[in-house]
């Protein structure tokens, strides 16, 4: 069950940098949360000493700095953890910054199961039982949980659901952004190792057998026109575009942010290049996609 109580930053918060302090119970998902925030464009510092957090913020406020969103993962194993957190909040307040505190928790049963699956001991366990270590940490962090801006219970949240919760709270985009690479290649040189989807366009006539087209690549207007004007080319592009829209929606739901579509022909010079350019052009108008074109095997012949 996801428990969310979010309070916006105060009116005194500095608009030049947004700061989130990520904490919570060990095993509740701090590491996963850090990765999600990184994917959202946040600069993430894991277990940065408290005395360096304000210095990091000062760097973010400096002219020309690219740090506009800073997330700091704070670990209960730090000495004087509770006091450290309050000290950081007070120091940032003097700079006109009101950081948000994200607290991650889970049920004792869920935490025990996760630790047993990973065969790890709890940081506060010592010579005690795992359950006692969890109870000690829960008591230690009770005051921080009470004052947190956002509390997420990850007991029954799979990773995609946790990612979605983090995105709702901390993404500046209403729809998750996905980076798409459309890559042409030649089958005779092997499949791209990083391809998520592979499509074979050797069903189209090969410009290699047209003397005036052979020297050119699929980027040349005459070759592109030849390939795209073949029977079935338009229908293929339209159908495959609609298929990709379904897949992209699924990627968003599963929290995937990168996709590589490999388009292959025999040598990676004519048909795959022309189709790659056309397919990328059809995806480019989607503001929620970042489309990149790569022609792996151009120049190899």
Swiss-Prot record:
Signal peptide: none
GO molecular function, one term: ATP binding
SUPFAM superfamilies for this protein: P-loop containing nucleoside triphosphate hydrolases
Keyword Ribosomal protein among UniProt keywords: no
Pfam families per the UniProt record, alphabetical: PapZ_C, RapZ-like_N
UniProt KW keywords: ATP-binding, GTP-binding, Nucleotide-binding
Residues annotated for GTP binding in this entry: 75-78
InterPro entries: P-loop_NTPase (IPR027417), RapZ-like (IPR005337), RapZ-like_N (IPR053930), RapZ_C (IPR053931)
Origin: domain of life: Bacteria
Binding site for ATP: 24-31
NCBIfam families to which the protein is assigned, alphabetical: PRK05416.1
Family: Belongs to the RapZ-like family.
HAMAP family associated with the record: RapZ_like
Reported function: Displays ATPase and GTPase activities.
Protein name: Nucleotide-binding protein MAB_2783c
């Amino acid at each position: 069950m996801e428990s969310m109580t979010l309070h916006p930053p105060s009116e005194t918060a500095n608009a030049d940098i947004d700061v989130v302090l990520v904490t919570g119970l060990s095993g509740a998902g701090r590491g996963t949360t850090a990765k999600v925030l990184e994917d959202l464009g946040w600069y993430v510092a894991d277990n940065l000493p408290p005395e360096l957090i304000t210095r990091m913020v000062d760097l973010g406020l400096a002219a020309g700095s690219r740090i506009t969103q800073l997330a700091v993962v704070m670990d209960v194993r730090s000495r004087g953890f509770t006091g450290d957190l309050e000290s950081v909040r007070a120091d940032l307040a003097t700079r006109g910054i009101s950081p948000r505190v994200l607290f991650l928790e889970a049920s004792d049963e869920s935490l025990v199961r996760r630790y047993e699956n990973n065969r790890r001991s709890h940081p506060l366990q010592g010579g005690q039982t795992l359950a006692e270590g969890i109870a000690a940490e829960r008591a230690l962090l009770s005051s921080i949980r009470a004052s947190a801006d956002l509390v997420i219970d990850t007991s029954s949240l799979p990773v995609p659901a946790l990612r979605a919760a983090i995105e709702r709270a901390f993404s500046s985009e209403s729809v998750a952004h996905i980076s798409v690479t459309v890559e042409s290649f030649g089958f005779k040189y092997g499949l791209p190792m990083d391809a998520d989807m592979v499509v074979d366009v050797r069903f189209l006539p090969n410009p290699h057998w047209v003397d005036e087209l052979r020297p050119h690549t699929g980027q040349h207007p005459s070759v592109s026109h030849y390939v795209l004007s073949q029977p079935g080319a338009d229908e293929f592009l339209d159908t495959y575009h609609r298929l990709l829209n379904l897949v992209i929606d699924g990627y968003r739901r599963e929290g995937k942010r990168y996709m590589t579509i490999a388009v292959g022909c025999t040598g990676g010079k004519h048909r795959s290049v022309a189709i790659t350019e056309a397919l990328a052009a059809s995806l480019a108008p989607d503001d929620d996609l970042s489309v990149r074109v790569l022609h792996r095997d151009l120049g190899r012949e």
